[in-house]
């Protein structure tokens, strides 16, 4: 979808996106200036060389925040993962034209209204606790809309069993017509193997580990679930990159928090319909780690690294801007 902000001036429909983007590029402190105005005050926006439009500061504040993330584009394009960014604009007296599906998704991401309950499929042998059931519903919600996320429950609260319930439901529904890949630390290989055998015994599990693992590469296409480790993800990248996956899961996903590391780059290059990260610590040291997680999951959600630093990281970490902290929280909350 294209993002346009149209107003009528003397009967002519004029797009405010180009002049607002131009203003933001020319005046980096524009948002701060506008924030200092009362909502009822107006701010002059030059539409062209001849026309200046006074825009209410209240509307301008709401419009500028989403546009900050599109400064590198002359014509902003919205994808599904940008839907949450539109939620605040619904509060304005705005007439929307088109994009209803995207706006509806934005509202659902805002409060998760209408999230369907998905019972574990027959053959899944665990009994999910209430919060684990909510986790399964959320994973299915993300899958339904082609989104990705971070399951960030604390250690011991069942991230593995929730993921297995999701994988099993995908397989029994017929949606998983290709294998899924879990990348985890070496210490977690046995846990994944044992819990899969206990809770999803009808899933075909293939462990790619050990010196003889290359002998089992030919079995990847027949497996439902393939398990490997972060070091082997890099070593076996040629084989793993050649396979199309249904679900790609990064367990202990803090291991790909460095976007320059080979593990992150290989993981980002893998072809998968759906992606999921499991970690109890999505953010350990700085906001750049959070950006790296979402760069793997949904590239573009938080812009490129340079734009993320300009829009979010510097204002939050160095300037202590609570409004941008809130904005970032609202942006990632549906996916975390």
Question: Can you describe what each PLM-predicted range is?
Answer:
Residues 1-108, 176, 290:
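Charged, low-complexity intrinsically disordered regions
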Residues 95-336:
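ASCE P-loop NTPase motor core, strongest for the SF2 helicase catalytic module
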